[in-house]
Amino acid sequence: VNLWQVDIRPADGQPDSLGVQAESAARELGISNRLQIQGIHGFLVQGSLDAPSASKMAREYLADPIAQRVETALVGDPKLSAYGGDSKQLVHVLLKPGVMDPVAQSTLQMLKGLGFAADEVRTFRKYWISGHPSGESEVISRLASRVLSNDSIEQIVLGPLKMDKLSIGAPYSLTLTRVPIDQLNDKELMELSKSGQLYFSLPEMQQIQSYYRQIGRQPTDIELETIAQTWSEHCSHKTLGGRIQYQDENGTRQFSSMLKETIFAATKKIRETLGANDWCVSVFKDNAGVVTFDKEHHIVFKVETHNHPSAIEPYGGANTGLGGVIRDPLGTGLGAKPICSTDVFCFAAPNYPPDELPPGVLHPRRVISGVVSGVRDYGNRMGIPTVNGAVYFDDRYLGNPLVYCGNAGLLPVDKVEKKPHAGDWIVALGGRTGRDGIHGATFSSVELTSESESISGGAVQIGNAITEKMVLEVILQA
């Protein structure tokens, strides 16, 4: 079994988009205005491939023969470093182990279908950097962590890659783990909540402790994770659904459930007032709202936010924000056809002084670029246009941007209702569970801090538009 590295670079006369983007970001973030950066992307392919097969694979199927050139060799071969020159700092950027790599998955599927003996594939980016003073490692370190990579999901390798195989992870065997909480004091309960990324409040932890004392046993780790997910802000809207006292110039109002007593109540009253002219079909009961359109179709519409994920991994956060909201009309009734998307973004000013950024906060320019690219790319891969949007700037969004993604779909008038029955099959489709996306729901219940990127980086899921596109086609045909 060999491990081949395929470097794909621009052909002579073609623009170096990766290098240009990195140089621009380095200037904008105040890292350096003297750097010259060359960038390429590539694949690591593991399998029983000889040199002629690897060369054919790379030349004919992994690169554009007109706009790109390839260099194929076993990992560690010196010629893989020659393109940028020996005097330049070489930096590789790879996804961390366990993070889903949709491009690699699609590539592996293609190569196997073409008859190549490929077992595993990984993607990477590669940069050669010059123009910094000799020995000024701080510049390279800042550039690598703030421009070339995102530490929440990616890792940096300085110099040539040194490996002889791709790690595919360790085998997993279920071990029943019980968490002893019956004798924990309040401080220890909150330490457990934080260390486990459960993000319960103290009263919630006390309630869980009380319940398991009553039934006479300790909870399993899976039970705690399940309760944390169900009670999270993301899933239960604790803030909007909670008891709130509101005071203004007109006095004080007490809400037992703010969401039910405002938005829900107002909608119900308007529908009752309209009577026979009510154009709402399904409200607050399915994955998306449904309103009348014509004799054959209803309009399905849903908007959701993806703020916390976009704050620590802008591209992935916005990418899965749109992917998730496309899923909602698709899962409404017996399945609506998503036809267009919309968005609203709220950011801090793009010219915010880099040296005034709080610890752990990404610069607004990087957030803006990542969010816009994430929404654009996912919609393009799904074949669903983003037809309108809005942007608002205010420095109060520095630590946590607002990223609203919406989608509209068409639903046949006779496909509004669905009812599951005992014996129905439940089918899970998508990427295997990996490092990404873990604690994505509970992450919504905690405030962002300077440690969020390192502690909760894995909470941001990697989108897989290619798989969702296939799921969409299957559901609509069914």
Language model segments and positions:
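Core nucleic-acid recognition elements
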Residues: V1-A478
